[in-house]
Swiss-Prot record:
Recorded family membership: Belongs to the NAD-dependent DNA ligase family. LigA subfamily.
GO MF annotations in UniProt: DNA ligase (NAD+) activity; metal ion binding
Protein name (Swiss-Prot/TrEMBL): DNA ligase
Annotated binding of NAD(+), by residue: D90, A91, A92, Y93, D94, S139, L140, E173, R196, E235, K360, K384
Organism of this sequence: Bifidobacterium longum (strain NCC 2705)
EC category name: ligase
Gene coding for it: ligA
Length: 920
């Protein structure tokens, strides 16, 4: 290892190597490779480290010693700080830490931010640095039918020129639905844990990997069986029982449960704080081998002692690395089919989620003969099971209105677990699709996931209708918009979709448009999400129909396990509050909003039913456990953007002194010509300090912490031993509200293409908006463009061009809301800047690139944007004009089309190279 190689370090969950007897370290020269390899995590060897002069070492030997000692120190740290179960004496820990400090002082290249020497107490965190894999970590090609699997099997036999009468040893394994992981061990010590990433570089998650109990910090077994260096590939996952336990804990703590074990494992493995990961009960199975080096002085010599996959698994078992118990050795295609059939019938019976069967040629020499494509080995394949289908009840069919007015029927299902997550709703696309499927409300229906991702209602189970005909009813698409009451109709004759024509003021459409303009694809206002958009445009959503379900003072209903809530009796004389007028009636007022405008906005919330029971904790003490079990049907209002009234905190003597110093500094600055406004600024999102609002009297309560943007709504009189004290009760914009206004200020200077997307022009998405903005240069030019002008831009089709021209034509109509929005935004400084020319090198000028499948480092849109930013054309289909096709996971027919046409197919790594250089 070179001395400038940066390593990231992590810790274990307390499982360190057992203390072994002296292995003869005294016979090796201190500082030699043999001496370093013979060191053990014992007190005696810690003393040896403390006495050793690191200045006598070479840089390479110092790096080896640092790696070994750092791993032990981090194991000690997690055992002490996370597990509260120290495994080393204080003297041994201190000696190892001093050794690291001396090494880093003598060899500065070893001193990096991830070193244990930079960690204060129990402060552990990850930065997920990108690290190159020692050897490439490839993904697998998928097949979805037995015919495709047989084609692959026959191609292997053919490419190896294997005699038909001779059995070909293969390994059959269940495909774990988890996250791929590369474990790097040097001299038997866990050095790093990396995610797959793009296969060439992955994220360093070593800190979190060390918390997984089944991953050993040190490889066990006889010394002659432990190599100098090895990459162990495998899968991190969560067992079903651990997943259910975690979700119960999430619900008890009032947090949302995870949708499936894979999501739970992914979220747990990417925690910034590894102490959280340590509580998540993650598991690991090894299933592959990367680089393996025994070293010249190894007892077995320099030859490769692992001849096949099964031998690697035997070694893993000796080392204490877990391997799946479901692996099978097979020698014929029929045995592969037997494995597929067995686990197809027993998918729900094993300890973890699975999504297929992996078949590998067992012999490593034959694997090398077969080689690999640009992204996957030819010696392995993943057979994916057909989409899992389950039955459930169709409770109802509702409709939702989208941002362009399209009205879509949505199936409301009795929640059912299918292919890794719980499904409770799925789109039915349009009324014609409902009729085509022949479904009735109340039917038992078949649900599956298309591609194991998108929920799909297949159709009814007809035999379940017998005797229940009177409980079923046909769905009829509404005549009027459920949100605004406008009459629905197709946009043009022959359309299957029906739309709400009330584009300007339909609350549902406006809400969806605000959500869209705040999204990452447009203005990227992160803290203006769905709930904030509803509060701005339709705060009376969920308003109760009558006072019978209005409970202004009930935020939750507590019940004992198994009990039902008591009936609710409204207080006599109680009336529903007056309906609120939305703050936004269209998008035009968005950038004129102030925090003061949002002070009185309230939204409706349902009181939860919370089950409370007592349990005994690990310390023997009783504690109450709360679990949300449903909604009560009772509604109350809560502030949407400001905090609830809260007593101000009294300042400590130290805080009062600091405030006095700050005020003195401001006064001094003012006497030198600076203004107070330059020093303190105005509250975020307000045109004037909120202190000018009625009821504000912060100056009257100098001993309390009353923020500059707060309003005192009342004064409570608190009786203490010294008498009656006046306590100001304040409200202020919430933290999310303050962040929202900050982000809106930044959005005023958004790129022109983002402004175009934010205008919600039908059919116009980010990639095409970029093309138009880049070609036209300014909003004024786009406003006056013709269809011919726009279609002259490479990549802009006639339908999109027509939509853009029609939208801007509407802005010129007197009283049209689109014109009002455009003028208001321009007055606020939005869209007045000309489009900036890309500062990136135009490496793809004149090139057409198609992206298919999912990439690790890019979303579908960001990949297209990366191509366009570099002067290329991001096409949606493969043709003879295509220059490159980027192949991601689960690539479909486009990959086959590219292969058929002989178009170069790129991995994600090659795509990154293409973006950077324009060549491969």
């Amino acid at each position: 290892m070179s001395t400038n190689e940066q390593l990231a370090w992590d810790f274990d969950d307390g499982d360190v190597a057992e203390v072994r007897p002296d292995t003869g370290i005294a016979r090796f020269a201190p500082g030699s490779e043999q001496w370093i390899a013979a060191l053990q995590p014992t007190d005696d060897d810690a003393i040896r480290l403390d006495r050793f002069d690191v200045n006598t070492m070479t840089a390479e030997a110092a790096a080896r010693l640092w790696a070994r000692v750092a791993a032990w120190v981090e194991s000690d740290q997690i055992a002490y700080y996370i597990d509260d179960s120290p495994v080393s004496s204080d003297a041994a820990y201190d000696a190892r830490m001093r050794c690291l400090e001396r090494l880093e002082a003598a060899f500065p290249s070893l001193d990096n931010p991830q070193s244990p020497t930079h960690r204060v107490g129990g402060s552990f965190s990850n930065d997920f640095a990108s690290v190159r894999h020692p050897s490439r970590m490839m993904s697998l090609d998928d097949v979805f039918s037995i015919e495709e699997l047989k084609d692959w099997y026959d191609s292997v036999i053919r490419d190896l020129d294997w005699p038909e009468s001779k059995p070909l040893p293969m390994s059959c394994e269940v495909k774990i639905d988890g996250l791929a992981l590369n474990l790097i061990y040097r001299n038997g010590v866990l050095e790093q844990g990396l995610t797959r990433g793009d296969g060439v570089t992955g994220e360093d998650i070593t800190l979190n990997v060390r918390t997984i109990g089944s991953i050993p910090a040190n490889l066990g077994g006889p010394k002659e069986d432990v190599p100098d260096f090895v990459e162990i590939r495998g899968e991190v996952f969560m067992r079903w029982d651990d997943f259910h336990t975690l979700n119960n804990e999430q619900e008890d703590a009032g947090r949302a449960p995870f949708a499936n074990p894979r999501n739970a494992a992914a979220g747990s493995l990417r925690q910034k704080d590894p102490r959280i990961t340590a509580t998540r009960r993650l598991s690991f199975y090894a299933h592959g081998l990367g680089q393996l080096t025994w070293g010249p002085d190894h007892p077995r010599g320099t030859h490769d002692v692992v001849a096949d996959q099964s031998q690697a698994y035997d070694l893993y078992t000796k080392w204490g690395v877990p391997v799946s118990p479901h692996n099978r050795a097979v020698t014929s295609f029929q045995e592969i089919l037997d494995m597929i059939e067995y686990y197809g019938e027993h998918r729900g019976d094993i300890e973890h989620a699975l999504d297929g069967i992996v078949v590998k040629v067992d012999d490593l020499g034959l694997q090398r003969t077969l080689g690999a494509t640009s992204r996957a080995p030819r010696w392995a394949i993943a057979y994916k099971y057909p989409p899992e289908e389950v039955n459930t009840e169709l409770l109802n069919i509702t409709v939702q209105v989208g941002r362009t007015g399209r009205v879509t029927p949505v199936a409301v299902l009795k929640p059912v677990y299918v292919a890794g997550s719980t499904v409770a709703r799925t789109t039915l696309h349009n009324g014609f699709e409902v009729k085509r499927k022949g479904i009735l409300i109340g039917d038992t229906v078949v649900v599956r996931k298309a591609g194991d991702v998108i929920p799909e209602l297949v159709g009814p189970v007809l035999e379940r209708r017998k005797g229940r005909e009177d409980q079923l009813r046909e769905f009829v698409m509404p005549e009027f918009c459920p949100s605004c009451g406008a009459k629905l109709s197709p946009a043009k004759e022959g359309d299957k979709d029906i739309r709400c024509p009330n584009v300007e003021s339909c609350p549902a459409q406006l809400t969806e448009r605000v959500i869209s303009l705040a999204s990452r694809k447009a203005f990227d206002i992160e803290h203006l999400g769905e709930q904030s958009a509803i509060a701005l445009t339709n705060p009376e959503e969920n308003r109760p129909d009558s006072v019978a379900t209005y409970a202004p003072n009930i935020t939750e209903v507590l019940v004992a396990p198994g009990e039902e809530p008591d009936p609710y009796e409204p207080v006599e004389g109680l009336e529903l509050p007056a309906a609120q007028k939305p703050v936004l009636s269209n998008e035009s007022g968005l950038f004129n909003l102030t925090a003061a405008d949002l002070r009185d906005v309230r939204v409706w919330r349902e009181a939860a039913i919370v089950e409370v029971h007592e349990t005994v904790g690990a310390n023997g003490k009783k504690k109450k456990v709360r679990k949300r079990v449903g909604g009560s049907g009772l509604w109350h209002q809560v502030p949407a953007f400001w905090t609830a009234p809260t007593p101000a905190k009294k300042l400590t003597a130290k805080q009062l002194a600091e405030r006095a110093q700050g005020e003195a500094a401001i006064e001094s600055a003012e006497t030198q010509g600076d203004t107070a406004s330059e020093t303190t600024g105005a509250p975020t999102g307000a045109e004037a300090p909120l202190g000018t609002m009625p009821g504000f009297a912060a100056a009257s309560y100098p001993e309390y912490d009353v923020p500059a943007d707060a309003v005192i709504v009342r004064v409570d009189h608190k009786t203490t031993r010294t008498g009656v004290t006046d306590v100001p009760v304040i409200i202020r914009p919430g933290e999310n509200t303050r962040k929202m206004f900050d982000e809106m200020d930044k959005a005023r200077h958004a790129d022109l293409w983002r402004v175009l997307v934010a205008l919600s022009i039908r059919r116009l998405g980010p990639p095409t908006a970029r093309l138009i903005a880049s070609a036209m240069g300014s909003l004024a030019a786009i406003e006056n463009a013709t269809i011919e002008d726009l279609t002259a831009i490479d990549g802009v089709g006639p339908e999109i061009a027509e939509s853009v021209v029609n939208w801007f034509a509407a802005t010129r109509e007197p009283g049209d809301w689109r014109g009002a929005t455009l003028r208001a935004w321009q007055a606020a400084g939005v869209g007045v800047d000309e489009a900036e020319t890309s500062s990136l090198p135009q490496t793809l000028a004149g090139k057409t690139v198609v992206v298919t499948g999912s990439l690790e480092g890019y979303s579908r849109d960001s990949a297209k944007e990366a191509i366009i930013e570099r002067g290329g054309k991001a096409a949606g289909s493969v043709s003879k004009k295509t220059d490159y096709v980027v192949i991601g996971a689960n690539a479909g027919s486009k990959a086959a089309k590219a292969e058929e046409l002989g178009i170069p197919m790129l991995s994600e790594t090659q795509f990154a190279q293409l973006l950077a250089t324009g060549t491969i």
